[in-house]
Amino acid sequence: MKQICILGSTGSIGTQALDVIEQHSDRYEVYCLTANNRYEMLAEQARKFRPAAVVIANEAHYESLKLLLADLPDIKVYAGAKAIDEIVEAHPIDMVLTAMVGFAGLSPTIHAIKARKTICLANKETLVVAGDLICRLAAEYHVNILPVDSEHSAIFQSLVGEGDNEIEKILLTASGGPFRKFTLDEMRDVKAADALRHPTWEMGAKITIDSASMMNKGFEVIEAKWLFGVEAEKIQVLVHPQSIVHSAVQFRDGGVKAQLGVPDMRLPIQYAFSFPERLPLNGDRLDLFRQPLEFFEPDMEKFRCLAMAYESIRRGGNVPCVMNAANEVVNEAFRHDRCGFLQMADIIEATMQRATFVAQPTYDDYIASDAEARRIAASML
């Protein structure tokens, strides 16, 4: 019986992970659940899955959460970022699903790696911000990082059985988001409500906006570089509106292996939990007769965030960290009508130019770079 800790259990990935665990309760148990603000939902989940502990990151909700679980004294209730860092180190935990959003996922991921827990990585910002550090730590502590993003899971699945066979190219697919066919003038006037209508995936608000700007795909290019040791020049983004081909790998003999399936995040979540085994999963099955499969080149002029992600890789150092911090600021501002859709890329680019460059950042440098970039980006709103 594997004991699982879910960081961000009330979000889109977290709730779907709990669905997987419920379907396979003979194999998986929830040891710990964490959330940022949604203490009522966290309490409901705790009542259903009976973890050993729950943690609410926002300490203002600690008393409310404790009150809601007062009749369940076996469930320990904690609060704060430090408590999350500590809980992932708990001895019974086998796997940590990092499903929390943004830079906040970095510290608990590092603590979990140092405690030699298997990492099921859904928090892509961890590798965007500090990919070099995370990969070095994973190697040092002999920890497996299993991708949960559908695209990276597809690449991972395509590499099973390939051993040391050389990757010639990674084909990273993108839906193109809701504004794929918009002109720049049309994109100038879009609002958060428009961007939150993703054509194929059900996701949280932050990642849905990142998908609309294609910053999410830029993050995934960086994530793929670190997970699979492939230079950015060998990672090609393909716009694939149907989101059926989740990604593919081309090998040096010209052969291509891809993973296909209906858009359902429970599949990559479950694969990370069960690897190398495949377990049954309730849900829709792929019907290739229902629709054609289309592929297009991304428009880097319209979707500048994707171009900036490649640029951040080229520049290296702390630049991806700076880009991520600026993006978190403008993404939130756009969702609250304090920033225009195209203005997001302007502010991110300006922040990348103005922030202090650090060629070989330490963990403390990442913390400082994140804070500096947030200040710079916020000053332009």
Model-identified regions with their sequence ranges:
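Catalytic, metal-anchored helix/loop core of enzyme active sites in primary metabolism
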Residues: 1-381
